Swiss-Prot record:
This is Galactolipid galactosyltransferase SFR2, chloroplastic. Changing residue 429 to A: Loss of transferase activity. It is a single-pass type II membrane protein. Disulfide bonds: none annotated. The lineage of its organism: Eukaryota, Viridiplantae, Streptophyta, Embryophyta, Tracheophyta. Glycosyl hydrolase family protein acting primarily as a highly specific galactosyltransferase. Synthesizes digalactosyldiacylglycerol from monogalactosyldiacylglycerol in the absence of UDP-galactose in vitro. Hydrolyzes o- and p-nitrophenyl beta-D-glucoside in vitro. Plays a role in freezing tolerance. May play a role in chloroplast protection. A beta-D-glucoside binds at residues 222, 266-267, 377, 429, 467, 474-475, 483. Optimum pH is 7.5. Disruption phenotype: Sensitive to freezing. Loss of tri- and tetragalactosyldiacylglycerol accumulation during freezing. The gene is SFR2.
């Protein structure tokens, strides 16, 4: 009995220490990341943001549009096409896929660190997964017409280039595909491995962009590793640095005079995590040991990022070593999500994730950056081993929480860390998947206001690039989520239809201003849809605990627009939602509620009988 009592005391002590540690961690997180701020935007003015008034050493503030080879190019036999085509076709393969799906449970902790999404294991708690066949590698691809055509940007770049030009943007961000230029491993020398016709074709596209009055921002690595490199381990191996430099030299030597700025790597830590830690992207199928040790100092995560950092530094030096009258701008596009804990005991996962993803890669290359590119899409509420679908928050079709304040906070945070280097920023990607186009318009305006507010606070930002021009292939989500300013009809020769957001974006770009009128029109339309209970597509599966699955959906679920004020400077952050935090919050707030419920009567008065009436207590349940 005494032993049992001792165990109870020890358990109670451990629970108290655990709760206390999490409370301290969350308090620190809240001070650093959730502190309230006063918006520097004067909302009483007709012009809320005037980007024309801002100049820097490189010239005026610029607007741009972005695309990438894997999203847009046809006639491309890359890793993504091969990955999409891999599907179980027999009972044996289906059974093997089921076993593999069950094994994904081991990766849940990694999922919380990487993207907070649990892999769909078709378990009993999945309210959407009854009798589903094994998941495909790429959702909404096999059921999409002419899936391999993507946007035909390789054979017909004119459509995308003209659409971009007509908005008035001055920067066109695109990429060159490594596997197209080097379709085979250069074991027998560069000359035999390079497709020089592809090099010339890329030059032809770049010339088209420039002839349409736009500067070129060229990305060298955008989530697409050549299949031959994946076969030997890809970025886990040092020799990939040498091969990447062979590729870089070919591109730079051939296209240097046609390119104005360079992005060596797009979101390197995202590629590393989803490829080498989760195995949910093409290029690797990690085993248990690799997963379990992935975030250790010598684990696959740090190892792959190390070689990508070495590759960036070498590419930076090579580009700057070219003799030219113009000074090149070389940087990376770094993905940053605003992550917050859903409950008190989720602060650990958020802290670990942030420690791995926010600063380490940029820290390792910060001495060799002419700009820091920020890719920002929204916020993520971490809950246990996944991301929570918070019913009171608005989301994109891809499951990203809409949170413009996060861009403001991220820019200030990065500026504070790197201001001693005097490195400017570029928002290299920002956008939202929204087929209805009702969310996209206020999303665009509010994020531009967040960006402008950061600039008013002293953050040097050279430009803003929106993702993307036309609806395209969205990685493992296929053709489900719609990110484009332009809709694409895949059943009718990829016919384009301009969305209203296209015209709004063009108006802002050409005027350089965000007006109060445009903000009100966009926001009021969203509010009208929300109050009417209108539905929109959503391409994430959700379990009975409202945790989102990483797997995309072939066909969307339907979710109502959310009636919540997420405009820049207006968003009210929810408190922690776990049971313990709710109880504690209630206990703390209860005395305040009671005080407010007391009827305060400053002047005594009497009834008809002359008796003194004192203030009465009102029931807190009134």
């Amino acid at each position: 009995m005494e032993l049992f009592a001792l165990l109870i005391k020890v358990a109670g002590l451990l629970a108290t220490v655990t709760v206390g540690a999490n409370v301290v961690s969350y308090s620190r997180f809240r001070r650093q990341n959730l502190a309230k701020f006063r918006s520097p935007i004067d909302e009483s003015k007709e012009v809320l943001a005037d980007f024309n008034s801002i100049e820097h050493e490189e010239g005026k503030f610029f607007f741009g549009l972005a695309t990438a080879p894997a999203h847009a190019e046809d006639d491309l036999d890359d890793a993504w096409l091969q990955f999409a085509k891999e599907t179980p076709c027999s009972a044996e393969e289906a059974e093997a896929a089921d076993k593999k799906a069950r094994r994904k449970k081991v990766k849940l902790a990694v999922g919380a660190i990487t993207k907070g999404l649990a892999k769909n294991t078709h378990g009993k708690e999945d309210k959407n997964a009854a009798d589903k066949p094994p998941s495909k590698n790429v959702a909404a691809w096999h059921n999409a017409p002419h899936a391999e055509d993507r946007l035909k940007f390789w054979s017909d770049p004119d459509k995308e280039v003209k659409l971009a030009k007509d908005t008035g943007v001055t920067v066109f961000r695109m990429g060159v595909d490594w596997s197209r230029i080097m379709p085979v491993e250069p074991t027998k020398g560069i000359k035999e491995a390079v497709n020089y016709e592809a090099v010339e074709h890329y030059k032809w596209i770049l010339k088209k962009v420039r002839s349409n009055g736009m500067k070129v921002m060229l990305t060298l690595f955008h989530h697409s590793l050549p299949p031959w490199a994946a076969d030997y381990g890809g970025w886990k191996m040092e020799k990939t640095v040498d091969y990447f430099m062979d590729f870089t030299r070919i591109v730079v030597d051939s296209m240097y005079d046609l390119v104005d700025s360079w992005v060596t790597f797009n979101e390197p830590h995202i590629f590393t995590m989803l490829t080498y830690m989760c195995g949910s992207w093409p290029g690797n199928n990690p085993d248990f040991l690799e997963i379990a040790t992935s975030t250790l100092p010598m684990g696959v995560f740090h190892r792959a990022l190390h070689w990508m950092a070495v590759a960036h530094s070498k590419a930076y030096d090579y580009i700057h070593g070219k003799i030219s009258l113009k000074k090149p701008l070389v940087g990376v596009a770094h993905h940053v999500s605003f992550m917050r804990p859903y409950g008190l005991f989720d602060i650990g996962a958020v802290t670990i994730s942030n420690s791995l993803t926010i600063f380490p890669y940029i820290d390792s290359i910060c001495e060799k950056l002419d700009f820091i590119g920020i890719n920002y899409y929204g916020q993520e509420a971490v809950c246990g081993a996944g991301l929570k679908l918070v019913e009171t928050d608005e989301y994109s079709e891809s499951g990203r929480g809409v949170y413009p304040d996060g861009l403001y906070r991220v820019l200030l945070m990065f500026h504070e860390r790197y201001k001693h280097l005097k490195v400017p920023f570029i928002v290299t990607e920002n956008g939202v998947s929204d087929e209805t186009d009702v969310i996209r318009r206020p999303y665009l305006i509010e994020h531009l206001l967040a960006l402008y507010a950061a600039m008013l606070k002293g953050v040097p930002v050279l430009g803003y690039i929106f993702w993307t021009i036309s609806d395209n292939w969205e990685w493992a989500d296929g053709y489900g989520p719609k990110f484009g300013l332009v809709a694409v009809d895949r059943s009718h020769d990829l016919a384009r239809t301009l969305r209203q957001s296209y015209h709004l974006f063009s108006k802002i770009v050409k005027s350089g201003k965000v007006t109060r009128k445009d903000r009100s029109l966009a926001w009021n339309e969203l509010q009208k849809a929300a109050k009417a209970g209108k539905l929109r597509p959503f391409y994430r599966g959700v379990d009975n605990h409202n945790l989102m699955y990483a797997d995309g959906l072939d066909k969307p679920q339907w979710r109502p627009f959310v009636d919540r004020d997420w405009r820049f400077g207006h968003y009210q952050m929810d408190g922690l939602q776990d049971p313990l935090s709710r109880v504690a919050r209630t206990l703390l707030i209860w005395p305040l509620i009671m005080k407010k419920r007391i009827r305060k009567v400053k002047i005594k008065h009497t009834d008809d009988a002359g008796l003194v009436l004192h203030p009465a207590l009102a029931s807190p349940f009134d």
